[in-house]
């Protein structure tokens, strides 16, 4: 029975005895409904029959929930019969997984997965479509990509014994060529991801801006028709004056309006709504989310979402509870194995390797330790313990609101050899306490209090 929406003042049709003539967005799950949420799923081969000490305990957590979510950050296909190609624009590495991953993930307990991220089209539309086919055959609901923006942005529905779950998936971090669009006139739709475009500005002090203005004015190109004393554009980057030097982001208003409408639409057809966003901003180095993300997450919950699950930076970020709904700003990595093959010719070139001499594993090792190339050099190396530590988040709902959130610290075998690392197990006590204390510190600015009981983090409401 619907009890009460988390939207202020809105009650369900059953609660007030009136016929629902507007399409209620009230939450309507049976008491005890549980959601497991994890971060990035980057895994290349099936694990069910392998030797992975401690992983069975993780599987028990995944299987115990009504809905188990992860970010599907890889493509699934058999390279021997694959008709696509590695794309010139890719998400930093060419992620690829064997077809048996689909049924293996299902057997672990995953029943719903986000697809919108910066790797969604590493292997072109063909890789996107083949991954969709295999997930469909495996019985895993997925959202965030499609043959048009309308398809990519739509909610996908999962039936559970305690209520119907809607999933919507978007990415603020994506390759430009991967953004889906709808048809217009005679121009057909473009397949791809549900993208939320951001406009990034660099915030600088007033004297810094004046120095940049001198550089701009000295360059041999036409200046602006109207000069703004508090903002300028130099070499394609927007600079603005402000108190704190850093980055600021503004969401594209059309994209945001479309996303909010689709959340409302998805919730009208479901009992519980998960929204997930892939956001590397402001960078993998940052423990804090970018300045746009809190406002975005809250707007999505106001529109009907019951949980906001962030991922992208491969590391933990803080947790906020808003209107008795969880906001996970990043759940880090869940799987992070380094066994992807083939890696593609571009990766060999970037890391100065020779495919006739070096191996895919050696390219991957270089990528993890060096990061990815930029005009300023290599940045974003992930060969640090923090990227191999995370949590499994188990949310329990009573009376259609979050009642308890349990956080199980995991470690992904940072010190293991390349062929064996990246598979989660429950962290040993000292490491578990360290992970949870970090999460306490990261969540405190959002007013979230996490207690630690027997190496498990608890948020009780």
Curated annotation (Swiss-Prot):
Asked whether the UniProt record includes Secreted among its keywords, one would answer: no
Q: Which domain of life is it from?
A: Bacteria
Extract the CDD domains matched here: MPP_CapA
Q: Does the keyword Amino-acid biosynthesis apply?
A: no
Q: List the residue ranges of the region (Disordered).
A: 1-21
**Free-text function comment from the UniProt entry:** Could be involved in the biosynthesis of a cell wall component.
What is this protein's name? Answer: Uncharacterized protein y4uA
Naturally occurring in which organism (per UniProt)? Sinorhizobium fredii (strain NBRC 101917 / NGR234)
């Amino acid at each position: 029975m619907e009890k009460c929406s988390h939207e202020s003042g809105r009650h369900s049709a059953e609660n007030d005895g009136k016929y629902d003539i507007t399409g209620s967005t009230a939450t309507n799950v049976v008491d005890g409904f549980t959601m497991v949420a994890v971060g990035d799923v980057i895994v290349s081969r099936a694990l069910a029959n392998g030797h992975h000490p401690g992983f069975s305990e993780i599987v028990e957590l995944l299987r115990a929930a009504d809905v188990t979510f992860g970010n599907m950050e890889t493509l699934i296909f058999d390279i021997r019969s694959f008709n696509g190609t590695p794309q010139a624009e890719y998400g930093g590495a060419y992620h690829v997984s064997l077809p048996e991953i689909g049924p293996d993930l299902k057997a672990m307990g995953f029943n719903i997965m986000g697809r919108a991220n910066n790797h969604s089209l590493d292997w072109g539309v063909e890789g996107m479509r083949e991954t969709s086919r295999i997930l469909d055959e495996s019985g895993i609901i997925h959202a965030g990509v499609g043959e048009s923006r309308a398809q990519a942005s739509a909610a996908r529905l999962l039936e559970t014994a305690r209520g119907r779950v809607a999933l919507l998936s978007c990415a603020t971090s994506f390759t430009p060529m991967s953004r889906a669009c709808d048809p217009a006139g005679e121009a057909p739709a473009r397949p791809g991801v549900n993208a939320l475009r951001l406009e990034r500005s660099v915030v600088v002090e007033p004297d810094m801006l004046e120095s940049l203005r001198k550089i701009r004015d000295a360059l041999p190109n036409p200046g602006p028709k109207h000069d703004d004393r508090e903002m300028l554009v130099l070499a394609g980057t927007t600079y603005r004056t402000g108190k704190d030097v850093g980055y600021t982001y503004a969401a594209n208003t059309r994209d945001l309006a479309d996303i909010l409408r689709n959340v409302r639409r998805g919730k009208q057809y479901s009992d519980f709504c998960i929204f997930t966003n892939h956001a590397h901003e402001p960078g993998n180095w940052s423990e804090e989310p970018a300045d746009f993300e809190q406002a975005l997450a809250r707007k999505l919950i106001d529109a009907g979402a019951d949980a906001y699950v962030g991922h992208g930076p491969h590391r933990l970020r803080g947790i906020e509870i808003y209107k008795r709904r969880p906001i996970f700003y990043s759940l880090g990595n869940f799987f992070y194995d380094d066994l992807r093959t083939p890696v593609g010719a571009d990766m060999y070139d970037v890391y100065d390797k020779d495919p006739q001499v070096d191996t895919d594993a050696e390219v991957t090792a270089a990528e993890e330790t060096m990061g990815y190339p930029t005009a300023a050099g290599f940045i974003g190396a992930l060969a640090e313990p923090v990227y191999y530590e995370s949590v499994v988040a188990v949310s329990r709902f009573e009376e259609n609101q979050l009642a308890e959130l349990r956080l199980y610290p995991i470690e992904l075998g940072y010190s293991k050899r390349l062929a064996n690392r990246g598979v989660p197990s429950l962290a040993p006590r000292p490491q578990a306490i360290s992970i949870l204390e970090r999460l306490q510190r990261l969540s405190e600015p959002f007013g979230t209090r996490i207690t630690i009981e027997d190496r498990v983090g608890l948020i009780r409401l």
